[in-house]
């Protein structure tokens, strides 16, 4: 709900102001450590943490298998309906250590309309 989101934003803001979360320190942590730190905050889940790592910290090897847009673009790329986490992770293992970069290309394919015939955000 909107009220929950407001309380989460306030909580994150307080954590930053109280220096319980120092955003610049995340740069020095491993991906797993940064995700753990972010998800320790109420309202910050795995999806949000991974998006922060990919788009703010510019981490190169984060695979956003929880993201609907990524999965739809993955379906388009590989012409498959199998988007189970295990299947996606196995197929995308070859992208490492550049998984985030590959994911960004898939997001770009979506943004530019390349996937429009196959992309259905809500079926």
Stretches found by the model and what they are:
Residues 31-33, 46-123:
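C-terminal accessory module of base-excision DNA glycosylases/AP lyases that mediates lesion recognition
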């Amino acid at each position: 709900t909107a009220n929950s989101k407001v309380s989460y934003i306030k909580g994150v803001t307080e954590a930053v102001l109280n220096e319980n979360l120092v955003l610049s320190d995340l740069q020095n942590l491993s991906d797993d450590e940064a995700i753990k730190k972010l998800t320790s905050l109420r309202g910050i889940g795995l999806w949000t943490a991974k998006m922060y790592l990919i788009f703010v910290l510019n981490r190169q090897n984060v695979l956003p298998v929880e993201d609907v847009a990524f999965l739809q673009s993955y379906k388009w790329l590989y012409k498959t309906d199998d988007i189970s986490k295990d299947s996606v992770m196995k197929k995308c293992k070859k992208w490492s250590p550049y998984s985030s970069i590959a994911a960004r290309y898939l997001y770009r394919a979506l943004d530019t309309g390349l996937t429009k015939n196959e992309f259905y955000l809500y079926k």
